Amino acid sequence: MLERTFSIIKPDAVKRNLIGQIVSKLEQNGLKVIASKMVFLTVQEAKGFYAEHDGKPFFDTLIKNMTAGPIVVQVLEGDDAIAKNREIMGPTDPENAPAGSIRKEYAISMQQNSVHGSDSPESAQREISYFFSEIEVFSAS
């Protein structure tokens, strides 16, 4: 089923010039980038985006990492895009990520794990609309 998902290339990966490699890996696995832009999150924007994690032990570190430099936000489209993107990324902890996954190849640590991806259709819609207006997203089909 053709669907859309949301992806972030995090500051740790942007700083290390990994944008191209990460996008290539997504495209080679059947996902199309249908919207993309580079932004620098303020602390308030990061807290708003990650509000569901407020109060968790890792929240402050997450906000610090996500505001440490620019990020690349993207809308991806493809068959089962949410599950496919999560498979390509690998689990949050790069130590547990399979060979060939983005996090295994590029993550520095569990906190600096290079990428974020939506985990459900509801999250994808919310996350896409947080960063993109409808006129900024183009269908690949």
From Swiss-Prot:
The record's NCBIfam families line, in alphabetical order, gives: PRK00668.1 (NF001908)
- Stated family: Belongs to the NDK family.
Q: Which PANTHER family match?
A: NUCLEOSIDE DIPHOSPHATE KINASE, NUCLEOSIDE DIPHOSPHATE KINASE DDB_G0292928-RELATED
Entry cofactors: Mg(2+)
Q: What does this protein do?
A: Major role in the synthesis of nucleoside triphosphates other than ATP. The ATP gamma phosphate is transferred to the NDP beta phosphate via a ping-pong mechanism, using a phosphorylated active-site intermediate.
GO CC term (a single one): cytoplasm
Which reaction is catalysed here? Answer: a 2'-deoxyribonucleoside 5'-diphosphate + ATP = a 2'-deoxyribonucleoside 5'-triphosphate + ADP; a ribonucleoside 5'-diphosphate + ATP = a ribonucleoside 5'-triphosphate + ADP
Q: Which domain of life is it from?
A: Bacteria
Q: Sorted alphabetically, which SMART domains does this protein's record hold? A: NDK
- One matching Pfam family: NDK
Per the UniProt entry, the Enzyme Commission number(s) are: 2.7.4.6
Primary gene name? ndk
What is this protein's name? Nucleoside diphosphate kinase
Q: Where is the active site?
A: 116 (pros-phosphohistidine intermediate)
Give its localization: Cytoplasm
